[in-house]
């Protein structure tokens, strides 16, 4: 009986570590498929990514509603160093809730460009809620999403999304991003703050190299 608890704990740690790597792998695929398909939207996104300070990749956001709508998903945050290289990822959860007469299911992939230090700092400050900070401008562009390239120019945050489902579009307004410290700890083997991962870049996991390479391919 004394062996059960340690083995269970070990299995739990392995599951969490695997979940973190799977999220990184799915994020890599999202970057590749959304930015590498040759469409005008992909080309526009690539231009913004080349100027971005950081990027948030959410490989799957699921939204469902029947009178009460909810939205959520898991994401990774990666920032660009002064040298141009990309950091390893910090892990985040995204969630929001809305009320209204809405029936349907929506599935979306999202790439969110943080265009400057102001946007990155706001994102790193505890919970970040889109639309809550009047000093942070947000533009949303993408298939099934309202917006235009023109409105994105000069925005602090630019969101590209590929949406599917019964809703006509997706709005990230009101979405709250929170750091997933458990995934960070499991992925890097230590208790670590998101700033140490994406700002001072004191963490490394070779499993994130394909994601970093994919961002370098499209974003320089």
Where are each of the predicted segments found?
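Small-residue-enriched, tightly packed secondary-structure blocks
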Residues: 11-220
